[in-house]
Regions:
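Phosphate- and other anionic-substrate recognition elements at nucleic-acid/protein interfaces
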Residues: 2-6, 10-145, 168-205, 209-215, ...
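Conserved class I S-adenosyl-L-methionine
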Residues: 148-159
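Histidine-anchored nucleotide/phosphate-binding helix
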Residues: 158-167
Length: 231
C-alpha cells in the first residue's frame, strides 16, 4: 500500500512516500499549481492513503497554522476522495534538520524530510491519525435541558450540532480533540478548547457527551450528564 505524506507550509509543500514499513522524502512543491502536481503524483505513485501533518504549539494547542493545515486537508479530501489522516507534527522540523546534517541532504529538501517523519509517525501508530471526513454527520442537543446551567460540550464527534445556537445557558465551554471538528466550530464563532488540562470539571453543572464517552474520566464532577444525540 502506497501512502503519501505531506508537510504543509505557507509557501511550500513537502512530500514523502511509503510503500511499507518506512518512508522516503520525495520532493518539495510550491503552492502554485499544487492541485495538478499532486493529482499527477497520486496517479503515478498509485497512492491509496494520504497523511498530512497537523502543526500544534509545543503545549499542544491549535493555532492559525493548524487551521490552515486542516482546511488544506479538507481540500485534499475533496480533490482526491482518498482516505486522508492528520497526525501531530510537533518537532518534525527539528528532526528534519538533524537528519539533514547527518546525511548531508540539501536544504531544499527539508520539507520533504519533515513529510517523511510525519508519515513514519502514522505508520508506527495509525491510531494516532485523525481521519478527515468528506461528509460530516449531524448531532443534536436538547437546549431546554441546559437552560441557565454551566455546560461543557465534551468532544463532539461532529461540528454539525442541531440546537447548539439555541442554548441559553449560564456558561458554555466546548472541548474537542478532532481537528476537523475544531475548525468548523471555530468558523461558527465558538472558542473550543483542545487541551484537557484547561478544563476544571467541577465548574460545570452539566456535561454533554456522546454515547461512546465513558463517564469515569470526569474527575471531581458532581453534576449531571446529558447525551448528545448522534447517528
Amino acid at each position: 500500500m502506497n501512502i503519501l505524506g505531506i508537510d504543509y507550509g505557507d509557501s511550500k509543500i513537502g512530500l514523502a512516500l511509503s510503500s511499507g514499513s518506512y518512508s522516503s522524502p520525495l520532493t518539495v512543491i510550491s503552492h502554485v499549481g499544487y492541485k495538478k502536481k499532486l493529482a499527477e503524483l497520486i496517479k503515478e505513485k498509485f497512492v491509496e492513503i494520504i497523511v498530512i501533518g497537523l502543526p500544534l504549539s509545543m503545549s499542544g494547542k491549535y493555532s492559525n497554522s493548524s487551521l490552515k493545515a486542516i482546511a488544506f486537508a479538507e481540500k485534499i479530501k475533496k480533490m482526491t476522495g482518498l482516505p486522508v489522516f492528520m497526525v501531530d507534527e510537533r518537532l518534525s522540523s527539528v528532526f528534519a534538520n538533524t537528519i539533514m546534517k547527518l546525511s548531508g541532504t540539501k536544504k531544499a529538501m527539508e520539507d520533504a524530510v519533515s513529510a517523511a517523519d510525519i508519515l513514519d509517525r502514522y505508520i508506527r501508530n495509525p491510531s494516532m491519525g485523525y481521519e478527515i471526513k468528506g461528509r460530516l454527520q449531524g448531532c443534536k442537543v436538547e437546549p431546554d435541558q441546559l437552560f441557565n446551567h454551566a455546560v461543557l460540550l465534551y468532544n463532539p464527534p461532529s461540528p454539525l450540532i442541531d440546537g447548539i445556537e439555541k442554548i441559553d445557558c449560564r456558561a458554555l465551554d466546548i472541548y474537542c480533540e478532532h481537528p476537523q471538528v475544531y475548525l468548523h466550530l471555530k468558523s461558527k464563532g465558538f472558542l473550543p478548547k483542545n487541551l484537557r488540562d484547561e478544563l476544571d470539571f467541577s465548574c460545570y453543572d452539566i456535561i454533554v457527551i456522546d454515547k461512546n464517552t465513558g463517564r469515569s474520566i470526569f474527575k471531581n464532577f458532581s453534576g449531571s450528564f446529558s447525551l448528545l444525540q448522534c447517528p
